[in-house]
């Protein structure tokens, strides 16, 4: 959904490093540190999150900025942090409407590796639609701002929306 591309653009604009949770996932899979596979998205979310949480806490303790991106951020992410940390964290989700995905599936699929060279994996339209709907629902239930792509994908517009959400 353009998460890594957005993180890359924000890194270039803000000069903040970013952590792709996909990279963390692949470290565990390739290092045989988990039996989970690239298809185990839901389980992977809860496997990775404790590690990501500690990385985020360490960055905050060292007064360092960091962008964390990926679909492995659980909607109840706040539960892992005390107020001391929460005051320094900004979070938003990116979703794509069903209509947008159906009309632009080929483009979404072909641009999925614009930043990362990914292993060949079959992109499933219905899975993308369901994941996007679920993320949007979870975000609404947990008061997480959403950037919902509904009619066109303009990275500059998305960057501006992201900067407003994080108040920079």
PLM features per residue range, with description:
Residues 1:
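ATP-binding Walker
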Residues 4:
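Walker A/P-loop
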Residues 8-51:
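Conserved substrate/cofactor phosphate-moiety recognition/catalytic segment
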Residues 18, 88-93, 146-148:
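Conserved beta-strand scaffold positions in the cores of enzyme catalytic domains, especially
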Residues 24-26, 73-74, 96-102, 153:
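Conserved nucleotide-binding/hydrolysis micro-motifs of P-loop NTPases
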Residues 43-93:
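Glycine-rich phosphate-binding loop used to anchor ATP phosphates in small-molecule kinases
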Residues 88-134:
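A glycine- and Lys/Arg-enriched "phosphate-lid" helix/loop adjacent to the NTP-binding pocket
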Residues 133-168:
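NTP-dependent small-molecule kinase module
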């Amino acid at each position: 959904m353009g998460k890594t591309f957005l993180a890359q653009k924000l890194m270039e604009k803000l000069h903040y490093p970013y952590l792709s949770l996909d990279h963390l996932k692949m470290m565990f899979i390739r290092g045989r540190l988990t039996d989970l596979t690239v298809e185990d998205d839901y389980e992977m979310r809860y496997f990775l999150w404790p590690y990501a949480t500690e990385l985020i806490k360490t960055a905050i303790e060292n007064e360092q900025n960091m962008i964390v991106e990926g679909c492995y951020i659980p909607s109840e992410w706040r539960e892992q942090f005390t107020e001391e940390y929460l005051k320094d964290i900004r979070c938003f989700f990116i979703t794509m409407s069903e209509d947008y995905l159906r009309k632009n599936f080929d483009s979404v699929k072909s641009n999925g590796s614009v930043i990362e060279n990914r292993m060949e994996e079959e992109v499933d339209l219905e899975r993308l639609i369901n994941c996007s709907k679920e993320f949007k629902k979870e975000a609404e239930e947990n008061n997480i701002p959403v950037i919902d792509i509904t009619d066109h994908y303009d990275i500059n517009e998305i960057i501006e929306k992201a900067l407003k959400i994080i108040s920079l």
